[in-house]
Amino acid sequence: MTATVNTSDALARLAAVIESRLPARGGDPDKSYVARLLHKGPDAFLKKIGEEATEVVMAAKDADHGGDRTKIVNEVADLWFHTMVALAHYGFSPGEVIAELERREGTSGIEEKALRKAQAREASND
């Protein structure tokens, strides 16, 4: 069930390819799907993220009823890919997401959510 691939390395390689397709780096929308998405702007890749998230849910629901469980992995791969396009557009890397997950490691999800709510309240009171 655990992948034998170094996840961080695979994400870093994919991120480098995606970043090379940014308009500022000469990504050609006629030759690259990623460059085309980026050229169309946030609405295009954000729409894809929404579509892929829905497909993850549908694949999981299908798996619950005897469907092909591997479709979950395929759809999550599509979701991660399009999310990485968004990260690149906004100037972030997968490493920053991993760092945030590591920061949260060992913290209860309930505690983390309560902390974020408290921080939001403090920010709105400023």
Swiss-Prot record:
Keyword terms of this UniProt record: Amino-acid biosynthesis, ATP-binding, Cytoplasm, Histidine biosynthesis, Hydrolase, Nucleotide-binding
GO CC annotation: cytoplasm
Catalysed reactions listed for this entry: 1-(5-phospho-beta-D-ribosyl)-ATP + H2O = 1-(5-phospho-beta-D-ribosyl)-5'-AMP + diphosphate + H(+)
The organism's place on the tree of life at top rank: Bacteria
InterPro entries: HisE, PRib-ATP_PPHydrolase-like
E.C. numbers: 3.6.1.31
One MF term in the entry's GO annotations: phosphoribosyl-ATP diphosphatase activity
Chief site of localization: cytoplasm
Gene3D superfamilies: MazG-like
NCBIfam families: histidine_hisI, PRK00400.1-3
Similarity annotation: Belongs to the PRA-PH family.
Protein name, entry field: Phosphoribosyl-ATP pyrophosphatase
Gene giving rise to this polypeptide: hisE
